[in-house]
Structures are given as C-alpha cells and as structure tokens.
C-alpha cells in the first residue's frame, strides 16, 4: 500500500481528521460536514492533504463552530498552517441548479511536500452529502476521489 486515505461524513469526518492527527500512514483526508474536535489537541506526525465540505446552515455540526467543534474555516486554517501553504485563493463555483446559492472553494496550495488544503463552503446548505444527480451544484464523492487521486 503506497497511500492511505480516510473520508467520512459527520462523525466520520471527525474520525478522519483524528486519524490524520495521530497516524503517520494517512496521506489525505476528506471530511463532509465533520470537523475537528474543540477538545482535542491535534499534533499530526506528518503533512496531510485535506478536503472539507460544509454547509453554512448545518444545524448538526455548525459551520461557524461551537465549543466541541472547530469552525470549518478554522479546521482549514489549521491544516494550511500545518502544511506550510504559501498561497491561497477562493473562487465561486457555477450555480448549476439555479437556486441562487453559492458554493465557495477555498484552496490553499504551494504547500510543503506538495500537499494541498481545500474547503468547499455551501451557502444555505445543511448536514448532507451533495450529489449533482440529486439536484445539488457539486458531487462530493467525485470531488473527493479526484482530490485523492492527485495526492
């Protein structure tokens, strides 16, 4: 096995981040509506690429964070700092379904060991797994797989 990836939704996303915080074998993490614990001090043993998807109206794991969970942007900032990423850009993705909601893609790149850190912020969206065939603007599964393949 040359590369190990971990992905999960909600608590599975928390688990994936925790694995990257503790295990040297994890190459990349994908988190959907999960974040990092506000109670746990993460000290990753190596650089790790991350991709994170979060709805801004998530009522289960709030986008802006709570005592027990970092905000989506704080989780992104943690991995950007850990991976020593020198550049960042944010773009709005096309509104394929025409609902007027914006998906923002925040990309941190030019990181050490060719790692990258991405955050998809889905305006007005809740605690779900996104799929274009269900009428959403993005397909989470495809984006995670493409991200992992490039790591």
Model-derived features: positions:
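Short glycine-enriched nucleophile-adjacent loop
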Residues: 13-24
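Catalytic histidine-centered segment of alpha/beta-hydrolase-like enzymes
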Residues: 126-133
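Conserved alpha/beta-hydrolase "acid-adjacent" motif
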Residues: 59-71
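Catalytic active-site module of serine/aspartate enzymes centered on a nucleophile-bearing elbow/loop
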Residues: 136-151
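Short beta-strand/loop motif that positions the catalytic acidic residue
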Residues: 52-54, 58
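Acidic, glycine-rich loop-and-strand cores that form catalytic or ligand-binding grooves
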Residues: 68-100
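Gly/Ser-rich "nucleophile elbow"/oxyanion-hole loop immediately N-terminal to the catalytic nucleophile
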Residues: 1-11, 94
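A conserved short beta-strand
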Residues: 25-35, 49
């Amino acid at each position: 096995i040359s590369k190990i990836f971990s992905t999960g939704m909600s608590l599975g996303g928390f688990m994936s981040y925790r694995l990257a915080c503790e295990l040297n074998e994890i190459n990349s993490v994908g988190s959907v509506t999960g974040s990092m614990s506000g109670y746990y001090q993460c000290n990753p043993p190596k650089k790790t690429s991350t991709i994170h998807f979060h709805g801004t109206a998530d009522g289960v794991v709030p986008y802006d964070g709570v005592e027990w969970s970092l905000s989506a942007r704080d989780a992104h900032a943690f991995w950007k700092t850990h991976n020593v990423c020198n550049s960042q850009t944010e773009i709005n993705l096309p509104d394929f379904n025409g609902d007027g909601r914006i998906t923002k893609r925040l990309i941190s790149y030019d990181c050490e060991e060719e790692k990258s850190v991405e955050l998809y912020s889905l305006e007005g969206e809740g605690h779900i797994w996104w799929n274009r065939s269900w009428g959403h603007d993005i397909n989470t599964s495809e984006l995670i797989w493409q991200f992992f393949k490039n790591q």
